[in-house]
């Protein structure tokens, strides 16, 4: 769970970002708020990950692959910069599992319901099968 000391330090270091307890970890670009679950055992890691989204100015995305790219960028920043800066041991396997869940989501989302081939995204939530046409 995120320590009060870490949360207070982040609030002091980033006064333009709100840090608010919530049910899930997430970054809201429109609200300029990092939401965090104060009871999660891996809370400090995920808190820094959501902070990375904020520092990278991540907001909406048009294509699903853009979301996966943003997740990878945020994990890279969490591991390479923020973990050392704030003295948080980031479990890189846990970070990779989190990123893998997005890759799996993208893989499943892009599968053609008729033939199972992965297609190409043409619009926000639409995919076109490269096998079926």
Which ranges hold each PLM region?
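Active-site scaffold of zinc-dependent metalloenzymes
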Residues: 1-43, 54-58
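Long, well-structured alpha-helical subdomains associated
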Residues: 8, 38-43, 84-133
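Poly-acidic low-complexity segments
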Residues: 18, 26-30, 37, 64-67, ...
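Histidine-centered divalent metal-coordination motifs
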Residues: 49, 53
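Post-HEXXH active-site segment of zinc metalloproteases
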Residues: 55-84
